[in-house]
């Protein structure tokens, strides 16, 4: 038996191709049914996200070409063209790859935790469709355990590595808990949307979104149970904010020193935190000269992100060591499975010999034959029958001069020669 991981991701293919290979929830259901009923595949799990699509299969024999043929056929794509952007891992490499993916080591953002939840969802879906057997059940449970160990024993997810996340972390560092803070977000683009999501998880007292287009502001505010104001209302509402985070596409500053001075006066000079992650800047640099206004720019955050990325890369090296060790452990378990059938077959053969000879001995005893002679005959015949195969193996190895084979047979038979 072998395990194969066939996939495509942000490193190997553009989004236009990744879209074509992605599986919708309905398609995953159909695909798992096809793979489960396929003659070559024993088990299957399909992981499909915006950045990657991966099919994990266990097969009786190595046959990655069959899996590629199935994938291209399922999506109606040219097999040759698809193969240019596909990667394939087999055996220990496939196991190692799965564990690396689950730990976020193969993600666009190093160490991101979302992929683990997506793999768990893929595994549960495969179980629901009876596409997971003993091997994959053990493999994926082991993978989840490894991901937890990496999170616990390294700092892979401890530091912010996006500007949006760093902005929220900076606010937390300064204020501690954010549950008593009022936050003003200026803009409604992708970066501010990410900031809003990170903020919402920290449960600030209030989030207000200010934007030139109120419709976009409302769409974002609805996601975080926030309020909406127009940009023109900033001068009259600024004093209510403890934290201001801005990221618009404006070519000129939106907040000047004078407006902030007025807001601080209305707040009785209670400090304000300004985080400007726009390029060009939304907040005049002179704001940082005010005693009770603390201004951080996108460059400040990029420095934090760069330092944190270095820390994550160091943690990733520690994670690789853990993953390598756990891959070896799983391979040992796989190999132990290969011995189970052999042991069962050998035991059945011995039991057959025993039953045959015991039945003959009992028959002889029933005819009145001397019991001692019957027992001796039984012992001799049982010994000869059990010794026949290893004796032949020893003789053959000796004739061929296979010293290593002879030593292996001695070890197997427990023969200790001085």
From Swiss-Prot:
Binding site for substrate: 49-52, 107, 112-114, 118
Amino-acid positions noted as binding NADP(+) in the UniProt annotation, renumbered to this chain: 187-192
A UniProt-annotated Pfam family: Shikimate_DH
Record key words, sorted: NADP, Oxidoreductase, Porphyrin biosynthesis
Pathway as given in its UniProt record: Porphyrin-containing compound metabolism; protoporphyrin-IX biosynthesis; 5-aminolevulinate from L-glutamyl-tRNA(Glu): step 1/2
InterPro entries reported in the protein's UniProt record: 4pyrrol_synth_GluRdtase, 4pyrrol_synth_GluRdtase_dimer, 4pyrrol_synth_GluRdtase_N, GluRdtase_CS, GluRdtase_dimer_dom_sf, GluRdtase_N_sf, NAD(P)-bd_dom_sf, Shikm_DH/Glu-tRNA_Rdtase
Oxidoreductase is among the record's keywords: yes
Function: Catalyzes the NADPH-dependent reduction of glutamyl-tRNA(Glu) to glutamate 1-semialdehyde (GSA).
Comment field (misc): During catalysis, the active site Cys acts as a nucleophile attacking the alpha-carbonyl group of tRNA-bound glutamate with the formation of a thioester intermediate between enzyme and glutamate, and the concomitant release of tRNA(Glu). The thioester intermediate is finally reduced by direct hydride transfer from NADPH, to form the product GSA.
Quaternary structure and partners: Homodimer.
The name this protein goes by in its record: Glutamyl-tRNA reductase
Organism encoding this protein: Pseudoalteromonas translucida (strain TAC 125)
Phylogenetic lineage: Bacteria, Pseudomonadati, Pseudomonadota, Gammaproteobacteria, Alteromonadales
């Amino acid at each position: 038996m072998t395990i194969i991981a066939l996939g495509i991701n942000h490193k190997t293919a553009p989004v236009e191709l990744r879209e074509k290979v992605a599986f919708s929830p309905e398609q995953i259901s159909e695909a798992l049914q096809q793979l489960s009923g396929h003659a070559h595949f024993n088990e299957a799990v399909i992981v499909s996200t915006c950045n990657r699509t991966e099919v994990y299969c266990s097969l009786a024999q190595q046959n990655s070409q069959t899996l590629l043929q199935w994938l291209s056929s399922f999506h109606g794509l040219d097999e040759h063209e698809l193969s240019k952007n596909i990667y394939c891992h087999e055996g220990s490499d496939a196991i190692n790859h799965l564990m690396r993916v689950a730990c976020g080591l193969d993600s666009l953002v190093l160490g991101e935790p979302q992929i683990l939840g997506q793999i768990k969802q893929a595994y549960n879906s495969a179980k629901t469709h009876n596409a997971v057997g003993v091997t994959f059940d053990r493999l994926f449970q082991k993978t989840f355990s490894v991901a937890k160990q990496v999170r616990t024993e390294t700092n892979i997810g401890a530091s912010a590595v996006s500007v949006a996340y760093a902005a929220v972390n900076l606010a937390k560092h300064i204020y501690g808990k954010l549950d008593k803070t009022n936050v003003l977000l200026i803009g409604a683009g992708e970066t501010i949307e990410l900031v809003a999501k990170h903020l919402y998880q920290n449960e600030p007292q209030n989030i207000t979104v200010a934007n030139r287009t109120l419709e976009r502001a409302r769409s974002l505010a609805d996601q975080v149970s926030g309020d909406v104001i127009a940009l023109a209302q900033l001068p009259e509402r600024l004093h209510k904010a403890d934290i201001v985070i801005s990221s618009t596409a404006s070519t000129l500053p939106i907040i000047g020193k004078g407006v902030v001075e007025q807001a601080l006066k209305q707040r009785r000079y209670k400090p304000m935190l300004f985080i400007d992650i726009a390029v060009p800047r939304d907040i005049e640099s002179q704001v940082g000269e005010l005693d009770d206004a603390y201004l951080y720019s996108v460059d400040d955050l990029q420095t934090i992100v760069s330092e944190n990325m270095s820390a994550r890369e160091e943690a990733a090296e520690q994670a690789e060591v853990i993953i390598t060790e756990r891959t070896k452990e799983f391979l040992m378990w796989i190999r132990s499975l290969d011995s189970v059938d052999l042991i069962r077959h050998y035991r059945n053969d011995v039991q057959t010999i025993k039953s045959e000879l015991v039945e003959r001995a009992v028959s002889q005893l029933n005819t009145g034959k001397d019991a001692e002679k019957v027992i001796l005959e039984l012992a001799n015949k049982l010994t000869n029958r059990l010794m026949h195969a290893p004796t032949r193996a020893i003789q053959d190895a000796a004739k061929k001069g296979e010293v290593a084979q002879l030593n292996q047979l001695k070890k197997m038979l427990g023969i200790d020669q001085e």
